[in-house]
Amino acid sequence: MKNILLTNDDGFEAKGLLELAKKLGKIANVVIAAPSTEKSGSSQSLTLTRPLRFIKIDENFYKLDDATPADCVYLGLHALFKTKPDLIVSGINHGANIAEDITCSGTCGAAMQGALQGIPSLAVSQFFTGKSLKNSGFDLACDIAYKVVCKIFENGFPLLNKQFLNLNIPSVCKKDFKGLKIAPAGRKFYDTNAQNGINPRGKKYYWLGKMDIKFDISENQNTDIGLLSEGFATLTPIKPDMTAYEQINGLEKWLKI
């Protein structure tokens, strides 16, 4: 039987993680290594300034105390497997990870860490609005992720080394689901948002709020943003090399000025 290392960034008690573990357990031996608390927005951050400790929850189920998702992958591979697993899956995230959000996502950061370790990796996220997640749950996301994992096991991982797959599920019920499409990451426009306050000792603090994010749907019709809003699930190949190759020649000319 194949072996899967499963993690997330919503914490070891998150419903998306537990339901996906149950679903993937039908085709693989699933070992869970998840953060003890929510670590959204942690990207591929690793904890380098203090020791970390695995706490066993159940058979093949561990939480890593106050760790990041990337920590869970890194130490999960080091401590929980004698040989590398066949696949690393991160999710199901409670919320989409699309466009530039991918760069700060803890869910995608875990998949990136897996890819850098040379292991096929898949990030899975469920888009939701309002109470749609409570109403629809993770059944559709589990089904689609299951099919993608089966395809990986049957046909091999379709990407080059150090690349991973980013799967996003639309906020629709099964009867309104339009299918799975390959899509590039879209583009958003970001602004800051934070609440100011004074702590009991009279010191000023800031509490980061939900980022003000906007996008032009006309420019994103065939991206993960547009297709997700139309009821499609999207599968996007992601690589860690963020070099803007098309700018290199222009930058060399600029440097000579």
From Swiss-Prot:
<keyword id="KW-0479">Metal-binding</keyword>
<feature type="binding site">
    <location>
        <position position="93"/>
    </location>
    <ligand>
        <name>a divalent metal cation</name>
    </ligand>
</feature>
<dbReference type="InterPro" id="IPR030048">
    <property type="entry name" value="SurE"/>
</dbReference>
<dbReference type="InterPro" id="IPR036523">
    <property type="entry name" value="SurE-like_sf"/>
</dbReference>
<feature type="binding site">
    <location>
        <position position="9"/>
    </location>
    <ligand>
        <name>a divalent metal cation</name>
    </ligand>
</feature>
<dbReference type="GO" id="GO:0005737">
    <property type="term" value="C:cytoplasm"/>
</dbReference>
<protein>
    <recommendedName>
        <fullName>5'-nucleotidase SurE</fullName>
        <ecNumber>3.1.3.5</ecNumber>
    </recommendedName>
</protein>
<feature type="binding site">
    <location>
        <position position="40"/>
    </location>
    <ligand>
        <name>a divalent metal cation</name>
    </ligand>
</feature>
<dbReference type="GO" id="GO:0008254">
    <property type="term" value="F:3'-nucleotidase activity"/>
</dbReference>
<keyword id="KW-0378">Hydrolase</keyword>
<dbReference type="GO" id="GO:0008253">
    <property type="term" value="F:5'-nucleotidase activity"/>
</dbReference>
<dbReference type="InterPro" id="IPR002828">
    <property type="entry name" value="SurE-like_Pase/nucleotidase"/>
</dbReference>
<dbReference type="Pfam" id="PF01975">
    <property type="entry name" value="SurE"/>
</dbReference>
<dbReference type="GO" id="GO:0004309">
    <property type="term" value="F:exopolyphosphatase activity"/>
</dbReference>
<keyword id="KW-0547">Nucleotide-binding</keyword>
<dbReference type="GO" id="GO:0046872">
    <property type="term" value="F:metal ion binding"/>
</dbReference>
<comment type="function">
    <text>Nucleotidase that shows phosphatase activity on nucleoside 5'-monophosphates.</text>
</comment>
<comment type="similarity">
    <text>Belongs to the SurE nucleotidase family.</text>
</comment>
<keyword id="KW-0963">Cytoplasm</keyword>
<feature type="binding site">
    <location>
        <position position="10"/>
    </location>
    <ligand>
        <name>a divalent metal cation</name>
    </ligand>
</feature>
<dbReference type="GO" id="GO:0000166">
    <property type="term" value="F:nucleotide binding"/>
</dbReference>
